[in-house]
């Protein structure tokens, strides 16, 4: 009798994706982050669902409802902090996952890569709207500043911003719609993640060498299921250390002050995972220019396949490209640091130099390095 997992219509899908999936035998721990992102997404949906049972999306009661969750709901505090810090873990995994894709040339799977970029945008939108919901000072002012960047769009900008706000300022209508979108988007992300996986399984996984591994595959289970479980345990360990010992480490103290439209916080800044993009936005004195740079700083990922000049797929055997890649990582860390600093000397000039460096590295130096490596190998 043939195994049910190979015949049942639903079990067959699971089997082909997680059990009998032919996988390269040499994929490293950098390939763990896909499954970790799946775990993060499930965790965020579950904790978010329980938070939504007690949260009220009204400007008068939103802040109090979050306080109520932490003080009066059984284990509400742990659910709230798992959700808040779970977002940070989500973005750490996301950045690692994208970085892995850049380093090992996984962007040559065009469909998978482009869906991934859409997923990144959707996740960033979800996280931004989630940050608005507790309705603290940074929530309200962050929403005001970030939605206001749309007013840079010529002719329709102001109307567009007021349409998104549902009035002439960030108020009850804005909070209610942000809650609605924050609730629905993770389910859209789940659907997109399935499409992402579908396209990946059309081609099979890449591997550190960048060479086709069709001649040598091993089943996903048990080899990579056990490896993913180890990754998941380490992820949960890191998350729980954060939640139980330093739950507010990555948050902003200003968000413990209820939103007050009459009092502007001294430094308006988003959560740490948006600081690199925020630094690029602030580095350009022109409003529209800053907004375009902000959007393009993420959208540049779509251009990666077109900017690939090397005849080798992976950076594993390309030392010049490796140097440029790690300089890019250092540059992004610099931008993240600058995004959290006040707009004053010397931070302004450092931010501007780091922003120029970011685009220069990706658009000019990486393609040049690929060509130099080709020539040095007489290819």
From Swiss-Prot:
Heme b b566 binds at residues 97, 196. One of its GO terms (biological process) is mitochondrial electron transport, ubiquinol to cytochrome c. Binds 2 heme b groups non-covalently. One of its GO terms (molecular function) is ubiquinol-cytochrome-c reductase activity. Pfam families: Cytochrom_B_C (PF00032), Cytochrome_B (PF00033). It is a multi-pass membrane protein. It is found in: Mitochondrion inner membrane. Keywords: Electron transport, Heme, Iron, Membrane, Metal-binding, Mitochondrion, Mitochondrion inner membrane, Respiratory chain, Transmembrane, Transmembrane helix, Transport, Ubiquinone. The cytochrome bc1 complex contains 11 subunits: 3 respiratory subunits (MT-CYB, CYC1 and UQCRFS1), 2 core proteins (UQCRC1 and UQCRC2) and 6 low-molecular weight proteins (UQCRH/QCR6, UQCRB/QCR7, UQCRQ/QCR8, UQCR10/QCR9, UQCR11/QCR10 and a cleavage product of UQCRFS1). This cytochrome bc1 complex then forms a dimer. Heme 1 (or BL or b562) is low-potential and absorbs at about 562 nm, and heme 2 (or BH or b566) is high-potential and absorbs at about 566 nm. Component of the ubiquinol-cytochrome c reductase complex (complex III or cytochrome b-c1 complex) that is part of the mitochondrial respiratory chain. The b-c1 complex mediates electron transfer from ubiquinol to cytochrome c. Contributes to the generation of a proton gradient across the mitochondrial membrane that is then used for ATP synthesis. Belongs to the cytochrome b family. This is Cytochrome b.
